[in-house]
């Protein structure tokens, strides 16, 4: 558990991911740091793991590819990052192997998050991921996407606890590395029993739990219920990672003070802000927090993302780059007009020209 010496009242999320709200009373360097307990240890079935960084990057479908992970690593070299979600059935058929086979190319710890409704397929996928170098296996029991939940995967397992526990037991019995679970408070408020579900996961063999503070019914609406996460934390003996509405170092300190969690996982807040994990990590250690990149640095980062995606994905890279550029190009004068132009640019050359013209107005350097 990371214990903060003083809890602070909760504030609304920042309008720009990874950036404090305007009017924030003090820079992060002056906030009371937590009592740093050292690396987080996760028990495996013969192969334990240690996390030097207690800030985890969530798997993000269509986002957390190797290019994105490399950017996060620039600010957080020791953090546990994840591949995009991997469908166990697709992996079995050979369609998702690229996400797993590229693990060896990453410089730091990489977890593989699996989803499916078949225990045997999940166990076999876990074996493949372990053989490819996965740091740990995470089981997705929280994805709210309807087509996944309807087939019994992701948050659909919240409606079938018996199957959920069979999957955990099967995966835990198939690998030596730690098996963790990412889940939500429940399917809906009226039926949610997060403490009971979490205890069952622990008993089935989960060695850590990441808990998003919303139900599947909520999706990403409303506020994450950190108090509910705290109740689950008090009931467990395995580590608990808090997730939901952590978009700044200040949010992370408040979340840990309220929940008593062993760490935090950030997800959507890093879209366009790959520096967020590193800034939170510094805050939790009581170290000076790296500044948020300025406009010129953001534009240089956007240009770097564009070239990396074009090199990796060819013509399709431009389509993928648009969303990343849209997230990155925020928080400075003229950003809205630039984003509009980037979404309409039909060629790499036109996109490069827009970024270059914008950078000329600010001056740019690599963040």
Regions found by a protein language model. Name each.
Residues 1-51, 55-56, 61, 166, ...:
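Alpha/beta catalytic cores of nucleotide-metabolism and tRNA/nucleoside-modifying enzymes
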Residues 33-47, 60-135:
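Glycine-rich, positively charged N-terminal anion/phosphate-binding segment
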Residues 55-58, 81-83, 110-114, 137, ...:
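Hydrophobic faces of well-ordered beta-strands that scaffold small-molecule active sites
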Residues 60-62, 86-88, 115-117, 142-144, ...:
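Active-site beta-loop-alpha junctions enriched in small/polar residues
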Residues 99-100, 152-158:
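Short glycine-enriched, charge-decorated loop/helix-capping segments at active-site entrances
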Residues 123-137, 141-151, 162-238:
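Alpha/beta enzyme core
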Residues 157-161, 222, 295:
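Flexible, glycine- and charge-enriched loops at secondary-structure boundaries
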């Amino acid at each position: 558990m990371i214990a903060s010496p003083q809890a602070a009242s909760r504030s609304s999320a920042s309008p720009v991911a990874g950036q404090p709200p305007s009017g924030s009373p003090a820079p992060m360097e002056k906030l009371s740091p937590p009592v740093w307990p050292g690396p987080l240890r996760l028990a495996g079935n013969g192969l334990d793991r240690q996390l030097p960084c207690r800030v985890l990057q969530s798997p993000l479908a269509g986002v957390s590819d190797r290019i994105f992970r490399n950017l996060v690593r620039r600010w957080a070299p020791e953090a546990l990052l994840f591949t995009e979600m991997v469908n166990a059935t697709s992996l079995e058929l050979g369609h998702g192997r690229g996400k797993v086979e590229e693990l060896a190319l990453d410089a730091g710890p990489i977890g593989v998050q699996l989803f499916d409704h078949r225990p045997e397929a999940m166990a076999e996928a876990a074996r493949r991921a372990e053989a490819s170098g996965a740091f740990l296996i995470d089981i997705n029991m929280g994805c709210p996407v309807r087509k996944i939940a309807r087939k019994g995967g992701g948050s659909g397992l919240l409606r079938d606890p018996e199957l959920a526990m069979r999957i955990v037991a099967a995966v835990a019995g198939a690998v030596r590395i730690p098996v963790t679970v990412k889940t939500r408070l429940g399917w809906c408020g009226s039926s949610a029993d997060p403490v009971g579900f979490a205890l069952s996961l622990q008993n089935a063999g989960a060695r850590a739990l990441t808990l998003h503070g919303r139900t599947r019914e909520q999706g990403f609406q409303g506020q994450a219920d950190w108090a509910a996460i705290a109740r689950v934390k008090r009931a467990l003996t395995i580590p608990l990672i808090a997730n939901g509405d952590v978009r700044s170092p200040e949010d992370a300190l408040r979340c840990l003070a309220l929940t008593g969690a062993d760490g935090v996982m950030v997800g959507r807040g890093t879209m366009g802000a790959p520096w967020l994990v590193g800034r939170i990590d510094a805050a939790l250690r009581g170290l000076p927090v790296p500044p948020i990149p300025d406009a010129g640095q953001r534009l240089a980062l956007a240009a770097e993302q564009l070239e990396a995606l074009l090199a990796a994905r060819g013509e399709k890279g431009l389509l993928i780059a648009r969303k990343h550029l849209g997230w990155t190009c925020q928080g400075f004068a003229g950003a809205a007009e630039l984003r509009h132009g980037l979404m309409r640019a039909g060629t790499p050359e036109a996109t490069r020209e827009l970024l270059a013209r914008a950078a000329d107005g600010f001056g740019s350097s690599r963040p």
